[in-house]
Amino acid sequence: MGRGLLGGLWPLHVVLWTRIASTIPPHVPKSVNSDMMVTDSNGAVKLPQLCKFCDVRSSTCDNQKSCLSNCSITAICEKPQEVCVAVWRKNDENITIETVCDDPKIAYHGFVLDDAASSKCIMKERKGSGETFFMCSCSSDECNDHIIFSEEYATNNPDLLLVIFQVTGVSLLPPLGIAIAVIITFYCYRVHRQQKLSPSWDSGKPRKLMEFSEHLAIILEDDRSDISSTCANNINHNTELLPIELDTLVGKGRFAEVYKAKLRQNTSEQFETVAVKIFPYEEYASWKTEKDIFSDL
């Protein structure tokens, strides 16, 4: 009977304690162990720090730019307010690195941890007795594993490659664009000039007697012509205009075109079939070269 009554009153007891706890004013101080619970500036509970913790170990790290502690032990700091600390020493015998947790309110090796709020462990030289002494502290997890000796390196290193690529791209983009534009312009000029030097002549229309003033040079192919020797001897191939009527296009090359033509004999209706090679005015040098060759034969 008694146990049943107590069992029925237990839920009521829990509800009453819940109601009482909810009515406690927020300004009433609560008993909390300050060593076990620390809050940040926003009022959030701060958890203990994760730091490299290898005490003192020999190292090959020099005090140039940055290096790693090579500590394989990661420890949870004993108190939430403790931060990560790294100490680099160099004396006549060896180089050592020390990685520990420590409270920034307490001096370490006689020096105040004035950089405890930093997220990176940037070394600062301290005046030690008979040795080179650097120390740093930081407040991010395992931040004392990567120790940095140059503030400039610490500032630029994370985005160093990105900055280099950006600067290089911005620097090279204008010259590259100009170079591409020059290449395209030169290519278009070459294509246009070649088309101008080798025009597509209309071969569908029969060509009439052409004069030298029309910028065309006409050469009579003596060795392939059936013209009579009397007519051929009476013609000066170099200075006289020939009574030629072009017939059909036989072939076309890079520098000239070859036509089948009719060589009129005086004013009569008689003619001889000849081959005529025609050079455009722009290919005067090629025409002169061939003329000199045939003149020497």
UniProtKB/Swiss-Prot annotation:
Q: Looking at its record, which EC class is this enzyme?
A: transferase
Quote the PTM field: Phosphorylated on a Ser/Thr residue in the cytoplasmic domain.
InterPro entries given in the database record: Kinase-like_dom_sf, Prot_kinase_dom, Protein_kinase_ATP_BS, Snake_toxin-like_sf, TGFB_receptor, Transforming_GF_b_rcpt_2_ecto
* Extracellular topology ranges: 24-166
What does the record give as cofactor? Mg(2+); Mn(2+)
**Which residues are recorded as binding ATP?**
V250, G251, K252, G253, R254, F255, A256, E257, V258, K277
Instruction: Provide the disulphide bond pattern.
Output: C51-C84, C54-C71, C61-C67, C77-C101, C121-C136, C138-C143
Q: Per the record's keyword annotation, is S-adenosyl-L-methionine included, yes or no?
A: no
Q: How does it sit in the membrane?
A: Single-pass type I membrane protein
The leader peptide range reads 1-23
Report the GO terms under cellular component: activin receptor complex; membrane raft; plasma membrane
TM helices/strands, residue ranges = 167-187
> A GO BP term, please?
cellular response to growth factor stimulus
Which Gene Ontology molecular function entries are recorded, alphabetically?
activin binding; activin receptor activity, type I; ATP binding; metal ion binding; transforming growth factor beta binding; transforming growth factor beta receptor activity; transforming growth factor beta receptor activity, type II; type I transforming growth factor beta receptor binding
> Catalysed reaction(s)?
L-threonyl-[receptor-protein] + ATP = O-phospho-L-threonyl-[receptor-protein] + ADP + H(+); L-seryl-[receptor-protein] + ATP = O-phospho-L-seryl-[receptor-protein] + ADP + H(+)
The record places domain Protein kinase at 244-297
Topological domain spans for side Cytoplasmic: 188-297
List the PROSITE patterns: PROTEIN_KINASE_ATP, PROTEIN_KINASE_DOM
Q: What is its EC number?
A: 2.7.11.30
| Subunit and interaction comment | Homodimer. Heterohexamer; TGFB1, TGFB2 and TGFB3 homodimeric ligands assemble a functional receptor composed of two TGFBR1 and TGFBR2 heterodimers to form a ligand-receptor heterohexamer. The respective affinity of TGFRB1 and TGFRB2 for the ligands may modulate the kinetics of assembly of the receptor and may explain the different biological activities of TGFB1, TGFB2 and TGFB3. Component of a complex composed of TSC22D1 (via N-terminus), TGFBR1 and TGFBR2; the interaction between TSC22D1 and TGFBR1 is inhibited by SMAD7 and promoted by TGFB1. Interacts with DAXX. Interacts with DYNLT4.
Q: Give the UniProt family note.
A: Belongs to the protein kinase superfamily. TKL Ser/Thr protein kinase family. TGFB receptor subfamily.
Q: What does this protein do?
A: Transmembrane serine/threonine kinase forming with the TGF-beta type I serine/threonine kinase receptor, TGFBR1, the non-promiscuous receptor for the TGF-beta cytokines TGFB1, TGFB2 and TGFB3. Transduces the TGFB1, TGFB2 and TGFB3 signal from the cell surface to the cytoplasm and is thus regulating a plethora of physiological and pathological processes including cell cycle arrest in epithelial and hematopoietic cells, control of mesenchymal cell proliferation and differentiation, wound healing, extracellular matrix production, immunosuppression and carcinogenesis.
Protein name according to UniProt: TGF-beta receptor type-2
- Please tell me the species this chain comes from: Sus scrofa (Pig)
Taxonomic path: Eukaryota, Metazoa, Chordata, Craniata, Vertebrata
Q: Which gene encodes it?
A: TGFBR2
